[in-house]
Amino acid sequence: MSVRLFNTYSRQTEDFTPLDPAGQRVKMYTCGPTVYNHAHIGNFRAYTFEDLLQRHLEARGYEVERVMNLTDVDDKTIRGARAAGRRLADFTQVYKDAFFTDLDTLRIKRADHFPAATEPRYIERMIAMIGQLLEQGIAYQAEDRSVYFRLAKFPAYGALAHLNLDELRPSGRVNSDEYEKENIGDFALWKAWNEADGEVRWEAPWGAGRPGWHIECSAMATALLGPELDIHCGGVDNIFPHHEAEIAQSECCTGKKFVRHWLHCAHLMVEGQKMSKSAGNFYTLRDLLEKGFTGREVRYALLTVNYRLPLNFTIAGLEGARAALGRIDEWVGRISDFRFQISDLGGALPANLSERHEGFFSALDDDLNISGAMGQLFDLIRESNSALDHGQLTPAQTAELLKLWESINRVLAFERESIVVPAEVAALVEKRQQARADKDWTASDRLRDEIAVHGWIVKDTKDGPKLSPK
C-alpha cells in the first residue's frame, strides 16, 4: 500500500507521489513559530504531527528535506520587543533558543533548515519577489507607501480555503498580518516604515519598511526548496490568510504550482475549552514539565488523535500517556532481558507478531491513522507477552521482536531515555548465563561481582537476567 494523505486543496485523500522523478526525494516545508513568546502546546501539536509525518515517510524509504521557518519580524515580534524595551534581534533570540530546547524535549527531529526571516539573503529575496510582482502589475504601491498584492490579478485566490470570492466581495486593503475572511482584501507584501517600527527597517527601491508575513515564507521556501514543493504543512489557522497568500504570490512569481500536497492539523482544546490565559488552561511545554510530566508523555498525548481531528488535551490524558508508556517500557524491558537467556533454539517470529508490525506501518500509510497504528502496537505487546508467558518465544525470536520495536520507535520516538548496556557488560552477562546453565555457581557469583564493578546490578528473573545501573 502506498502512503495516502488528505490534501486540503482537493479535499481528497490522495496517493503521495513526490515530484522527484526517482520518487525518493521529498521537499517539505512546515510553518514554524513566531518567536515573540514561548510556543504553546497548540503549536506543538502541529510540530509533533509534522515530525510523525517525516519519520513515517523516512521509514517508507523517502529522503525528506524539511524546512521550518522562524518568523522573527512581524507585527507581534515588533510589539513584543518594543514592550520589553529590547532590540528585535535580542528579544527574538531568547524565544528561538527556547524553541529549540522544546523541540529536543519533545523528541521532534530538527529540520534540515531553520531560516529566519531577518537573515539578509532572505530579505533580499523578498525584495526581489516584490519587485517582480510590481513589474508584472500584480502588486502596487498605495498612498500609505506600503506595497500590496492585487487579488484581482490571481483568480485562483481562495481555492485552498474553498472561499467564494464573489460572495465575499473583496474590497479595500488589509495591512495587518492576520485577519478574518470577512475582511478579505489586497494583502500587504511590504509595510512602509512608521515610528512604531523603531529601528526595524530595510531599504527597498520603493522605500524603507519591512516585509509582510506572507512573503517571508514564500521567499524562504522557494530559496531553499525551489519553486515547487511536495508537502506544505501547518495548522488549520494557517490556511487563511497565510497559506492562501503564499500560493498567490509564489505562483505569480514562478509560474509553477507551488505545492502538491497541503496538510493541516486541527485545533487543540484544553479540558474541553479553547486554550486561553484568562481561562487558566494555557500551557507551554515548560508549564507541563513543572507539573511533573516529561517530554515524551506530552509527545504521546499530542499524538493520540489523528492530526485532522480536534484534540482535547487534558491532565487526565497526560496521566493516561504515562500509564501507556509504562506498559511499553515494561514490555521493552522484558524482551530486552529475555534475549540473554541461553538457548540453541532459533526460528522466525510467529506470523501474527510480524503481521502486527506490518499493520502498524500500514495504518500510518492511511493518512497517518495513529489510532490504528497504536492499536496494532498494543496488540503486538499483548500477543508477545502471552507468547512469553507460555514459553512460545526463544531468545533469538525476542531479539527479532526487539528489532521490530526499534523500527516502530524510530517513527514514534516513545522509548524511555535509553540506558545503553556497554558491550563488555553484555558479554559478562552472557558468560554468567552460561555459567548458571553449567551450574558453575562460583563462576556465576564472580561474574555477578565483576558486573557490579562496572556499575551494573544483575537480577535473575523467570524471563532471564535483568540489568539495571547501580
Predicted features along the sequence, with ranges:
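Alpha-helix C-terminal capping/helix-coil junction sites
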Residues: 58, 104, 134-135, 263, ...
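Structural preference for alpha-helix termini/caps and helix-kink/transition segments
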Residues: 281-470
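The substrate-binding groove and active-site-proximal loops of carbohydrate-active enzymes
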Residues: 81-88, 114-119, 235
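Short, solvent-exposed turn/loop segments enriched in Gly/Ser/Thr/Pro and often Arg
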Residues: 67-74, 117-120, 237
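Short, well-structured beta-strand/strand-turn elements
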Residues: 63-65, 137-143, 457-459
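Alpha-helical recognition segments enriched in aromatics with Gly/Pro capping
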Residues: 1-36, 47, 51, 124-336
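N-terminal, positively charged nucleic-acid-binding surface of large information/translation enzymes
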Residues: 10-13, 18-109, 467
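N-terminal, positively charged, Ser/Thr/Ala/Gly-biased leader segments
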Residues: 104-114, 120-137
